[in-house]
Amino acid sequence: MMILKIGGSVITDKSAYRTARTYAIRSIVKVLSGIEDLVCVVHGGGSFGHIKAMEFGLPGPKNPRSSIGYSIVHRDMENLDLMVIDAMIEMGMRPISVPISALRYDGRFDYTPLIRYIDAGFVPVSYGDVYIKDEHSYGIYSGDDIMADMAELLKPDVAVFLTDVDGIYSKDPKRNPDAVLLRDIDTNITFDRVQNDVTGGIGKKFESMVKMKSSVKNGVYLINGNHPERIGDIGKESFIGTVIR
């Protein structure tokens, strides 16, 4: 069983509002369509989520301006999600959109609808999104957060994160030409020893992956989504990426 997250930096131009990389979406989905044990897909927002969230003060207190922003961010994320869903349907897959904003009940997320879709043979697709945190504030639940929840609920064999880098390095490869790609990381390592922030968020992602490992049987993988065919090399000597065991 595999769960997989497509990073927003892979399928959007993060510097240009609501600009999708449609070729990347199609190439990734083409690979995903051949994975029989893929049970859940999550994707980030990139320029469909972050830009307007920052502009309207999300996450943050509930007020007239942030409420408008809430609607805009959710609409934009739905539009990006529809592109992913359309590509999956075109490849013969059975996706079903399950927005995280609709799963919030009594201060927690209830994934019962998502699990039911998996049991029925569908591939649920969720994404980082806004949600009503309480009567006074709005929150944002990231794709990484959803992946952590899915790992705990489903106990998959493999969890995969597709990003715009080849993996986690020993040092920042942009500043250190001698940086080495860490192909296999023991969970006892600390990020202080992995002096890398090649995307501006690898540190946080690394921590999320380490926390997930206890719920994933055969490793949490970080793979360059611009080369989705590398998913097929998981477990092989030729694999390029990072696995946390």
From Swiss-Prot:
Q: What is its EC number?
A: 2.7.4.26
Sites marked Transition state stabilizer:
14
A GO term, aspect molecular function: ATP binding
Give the keywords, sorted: ATP-binding, Isoprene biosynthesis, Kinase, Nucleotide-binding, Transferase
Q: Which domain of life is it from?
A: Archaea
Classification via SUPFAM superfamilies: Carbamate kinase-like (SSF53633)
One CC-aspect GO term: cytosol
Q: What is this protein called?
A: Isopentenyl phosphate kinase
